[in-house]
Amino acid sequence: MKLQGSLACLLLALCLGGGAANPLHSGGEGTGASAAHGAGDAISHGIGEAVGQGAKEAASSGIQNALGQGHGEEGGSTLMGSRGDVFEHRLGEAARSLGNAGNEIGRQAEDIIRQGVDAVHNAGSWGTSGGHGAYGSQGGAGVQGNPGPQGTPWASGGNYGTNSLGGSVGQGGNGGPLDYETNAQGAVAQPGYGTVRGNNQNSGCTNPPPSGSHESFSNSGGSSNDGSRGSQGSHGSNGQGSSGRGGGQGNSDNNGSSSSSSGSNSGNSNSGNSGNSNSGNSGNSGSGSRDIETSNFDEGYSVSRGTGSRGGSGGSGGSGGSGGSGGSGGGNKPECNNPGNDVRMAGGSGSQGHGSNGGNIQKEAVNGLNTMNSDASTLPFNIDNFWENLKSKTRFINWDAINKGHAPSPSTRALLYFRKLWENFKRSTPFFNWKQIEGSDLSSLQKRAGGADQFSKPEARQDLSADSSKNYYNNQQVNPTYNWQYYTKTTAKAGVTPSSSSASRAQPGLLKWLKFW
């Protein structure tokens, strides 16, 4: 009974510990800690007392019963006084050790419950979400550059007009406004490359600059006229001097800077100086430029294919300068697959100026057209080739006879054609006795078969008629033999043209067959 009571106390202590741990979700950290401490003390004291008292009482009662039954009432009372105290002392020590073990178990349970309280408390509180990062400020548009001073042309022949170089391109800062600079000629420099595009999810995508030159070199020849004003570039760029579209033909301006637009770099190549002539000034070289088109892809980063301007025609004895080649569009990284990147194409190369001794470029164009028109092989249709192909595909026609004029008359050709059809019909119907149907006489057979010696005797004629009548009426043979007639043909190449009367005489059986039907 004592042992059962101890177990009941242990279960009650555990239940109280579970009930004390229940308010942890609502009471906070202090309530959970106190409940855990109380549950640990209850478990330790309950286990120690229950185990110690139960073991002590069970051992005492067991020893007393054993000694009483084994030695009788007298000996039992004597031994009970001496040995009972010894066993009771030892069992008390064992009970104390078990109580210490129960206290240790209680402390471990208290630590476990306290850890659970801390975990529940930490999970119940949620931290506030971090704020969104501030967006970078939009870079301001550049100020339009003022046109620079006009270059002074030199009057003396053979000297080259100098032209100051354009300023270097400013490097745009990351996230900052785009830097614009004006060069000495007034052309607005392009925005710096290397900046991150706006609205681009690939933060590491930067645009390398195009392969064209950032600076404009345009050294014009002597005694050059002022070129026409360049076309107005987009976003405040103003080209001074001759550009790809507005430059005067033959003469390049001293202020040879190209037009540019915001968000794209027009690559201008160095236009070479033309050669010296024996007399007079050398031709002027056209400055390379590109036609810039803006689009709505990614902040204006679309570069279309540019074409270089044609070099000017040479003066007397001077050769024309070469046109500048348009710069190619900037490269794209493979990971930056944006829709705007597909339009960035390579720039076209400028055309070479062909100068002659006082000549004109239009003469070469006219000569080229005349050469193309005079060449018959380049024509899309050639009647000779067509006629040869037609004759090769229609070999059943005697083209040689047609070309030589030896073709037979239409009536003769019709009779020959029908004769061929008639012979084919008789060969396809061997079950008819065509000799009796046609009723051909011996003279016609001799003429057609060429065997006059075979049918010269009357007996042979009678035997032939008797045999043929017998074969016609009795028809005893399975495969009757026929005397097929083969007519002598006169070829058209031999030059013999049979008349209609001769053709009708060669076909007496055909006329009789028509009368029979």
Curated annotation (Swiss-Prot):
Q: In which tissues is it expressed?
A: Highly expressed in stratified epithelia; such as the skin, tongue, esophagus, forestomach and vagina. Also found in lung, trachea and urinary bladder.
User: Keyword annotations for this protein?
Assistant: Differentiation, Glycoprotein, Secreted, Signal
Polar residues composition bias: residue spans: 197-206
Low complexity bias locations: 212-235, 251-289
Q: Where are the transmembrane segments?
A: none
Q: Write the signal peptide boundaries.
A: 1-21
Which subcellular locations apply to this protein? Secreted
Q: Where is this region: Disordered?
A: 51-83, 123-364
Claim: Signal is one of the keywords in the record: yes
Its primary localisation, in coarse terms, equals secreted
Q: Which CDD domains match?
A: dermokine
Q: Which GO terms describe its cellular component?
A: extracellular space
Biological role: May act as a soluble regulator of keratinocyte differentiation.
Stated family: Belongs to the dermokine family.
Q: How does it assemble?
A: Homooligomer. Seems to be able to homodimerize and homotrimerize.
Name of this chain's protein:
Dermokine
- Say which species the protein is native to: Mus musculus (Mouse)
